[in-house]
């Protein structure tokens, strides 16, 4: 659903149901550290992308389809904010004192189970369990539009043990936010976001796990170099087969590869512009953010 400005402000004061997976380190889209930085105001909230806008656009249609399939359900759309400590949610719809409704869209059925089952992707499961906890209901309906044309429904029952774990985990995460105690980085982006702007001149003794990671990186880089060489040799063979012609086909006429001329790119000559218009260039030149460069040293003989 699309949040109102007031709801967005409220969301800054806690963890929304759709953010629970990130708070617990189980989101495929955002790490705990990334969410922590958003809640602390150290990083902007993720920009709305095309799939998110599409989901917002078709949500009324999916809700309408859900109402058509269940004409006896007393569906109330977009109820007000529900809250319990740092946990909060803005439901797509619900049947008061009976069930929540969480609309989803997906390109494919990958990660989804049988129709009417509770087999939904983990981050969605954590979301609807959180919503059921806040709404104090025992059932969550999840109507889904797959690929823009395939409607289906899933039904998830409340799991009190899982809800307790969610509530405890969100509480711990929010305590970190309030204390200014960031979660440990788990991705390269996390590490860069936390430590990538400045460094101090000092040395750290590598432990056994770090030494193993260094060895793994060296091995992988060597394998990558070998694969790149093999790919380049294969590429050269294919280009020789094409010669001046632009399309390679198999015996059935199916296109295997193309090598076509493209329009020459237009590039802005920064050096020439700076020489011709130094004052204007200076006016529109801004210093970049400081950053650190990681270098993996070659193994000594």
Where on the chain are the PLM-derived regions?
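Accessory terminal regions of nucleic-acid processing enzymes
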Residues: 1-301
């Amino acid at each position: 659903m699309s949040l109102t400005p007031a709801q967005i402000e409220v969301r800054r004061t806690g963890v929304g149901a759709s953010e629970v997976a990130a708070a617990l380190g189980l989101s495929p889209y955002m790490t705990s550290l990334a969410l922590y930085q958003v809640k602390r105001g150290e990083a902007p909230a993720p920009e709305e992308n095309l799939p998110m806008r599409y989901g917002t656009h078709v949500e009324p249609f999916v809700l309408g389809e859900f109402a058509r399939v269940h004409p006896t359900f007393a569906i109330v759309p977009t109820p007000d904010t529900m809250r319990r400590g740092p946990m909060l949610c803005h439901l797509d719809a619900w049947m008061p004192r009976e069930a929540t409704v969480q609309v989803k869209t997906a390109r494919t059925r990958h990660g989804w189970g049988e129709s009417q089952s509770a087999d939904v992707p983990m981050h969605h499961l954590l979301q609807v369990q959180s919503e059921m906890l806040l709404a104090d209901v025992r059932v969550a309906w999840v109507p889904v539009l797959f690929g823009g044309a395939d409607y289906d429904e899933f039904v998830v029952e409340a799991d009190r043990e899982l809800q307790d774990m969610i509530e405890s985990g969100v509480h711990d995460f929010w305590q970190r936010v309030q204390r200014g105690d960031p979660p440990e980085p788990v991705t390269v982006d996390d590490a860069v976001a936390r430590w990538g702007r400045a460094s101090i001149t000092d040395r750290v003794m590598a432990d056994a796990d770090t030494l193993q990671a260094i060895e793994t990186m060296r091995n992988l880089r060597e394998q990558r170099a070998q694969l790149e060489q093999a790919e380049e040799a294969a590429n050269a063979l294919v280009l020789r087969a094409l010669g001046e012609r632009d399309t390679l086909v198999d015996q059935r006429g199916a296109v295997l590869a193309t090598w076509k001329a493209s329009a020459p790119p237009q590039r802005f000559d920064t050096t020439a512009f700076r020489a011709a218009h130094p004052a204007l260039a200076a006016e529109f030149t801004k210093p970049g953010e400081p950053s650190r460069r990681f270098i993996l040293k070659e193994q000594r003989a």
